[in-house]
Amino acid sequence: MIYRINRKIIKTYEKTLKAVFSMRARNKSFVTFSKIGLVRLGNQLFRYAALKSYSLRNKVPIILPPDTEHRLNNFKIEYLSKPLYWLNYSSDSKYVEKKFNFDSNFFSFHNRTEINGFFQTEKYFKDIRQILQTDLKLANCKKEKKAIENIKLIKQEFPGKKIVSIHVRRGDYVPSSKPYSDGITDYSPDRHLKHPLMTVDYFQSAAARFQNAVFLIFSDTNQDIEWCKENLNIKNAVYIHNEDLIDFKMMQFSDHNIISNSSFSWWAAWLNDNDRKQIISPKKENWFGEFYSHYNMNDLIPRDWEQL
């Protein structure tokens, strides 16, 4: 009985390898990022955008493992799904990001390419903006409509007012003597040395740039929202806390954006389709803490955003 089971396993394994090497023999090109899910949502979007840009420029499909950790399935993104072992056997060239700013050599790799890095600059994907705006609509139409409806209701409540989103990133950025886990990654207590909190003065100064506005204030948890109520002291403020995808879309559908040093709010602002939008961002040198002070940050903040 054991012998028969082992024979079956061996045949399945041989069949899999045969399919893999058959694909290689036919020189089927693709691009993949097998570790795309090992970061939080905003960083996953940077990685996906770079993948998509590479895919379109080199005319190769995107292949990803069916990884429950990545959250791309929340969006209207199309890609081929293959098991991780398939990717490990099939990819024959690798691109690893060596520096934080834009690298034009990224697009020169061909055939079956595995990429790895953060790709945190629009220079990798600015020219496919409209495509990404379509891809990054929520797969759950009800959630997308909920965000749109929420913005409409706020505009009805505050007629004639500009809708300005403020994202106050706290959560794991708050200094703590205890480790922190978001369910994906375990963070050490010194995380604030990597990602400093933006000051109250930053948010107040940014808000002061907008006249005749209502401010939608978003943060990580109910506790963080309470902190905002007690400390920000911004007039005409509405405090919002839904599930993160609806918050993300509400920020995107606002008229203007004030962001934190957060890839989550970076993406909500970047996807904002208002032609007259004003986006205020922390200065590039304040994005990371001393732990990442050696990073070249010149390409992170789009040129048409105001750094404060």
Where in the sequence are the language-model features?
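Secretory-pathway luminal glycosyltransferase catalytic domains
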Residues: 26-31, 67-205, 209, 301-304
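A short, glycine/small-residue-rich beta-strand->loop->alpha-helix junction that serves as a flexible
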Residues: 36-46
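Histidine-anchored nucleotide/phosphate-binding helix
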Residues: 44-56, 200-207
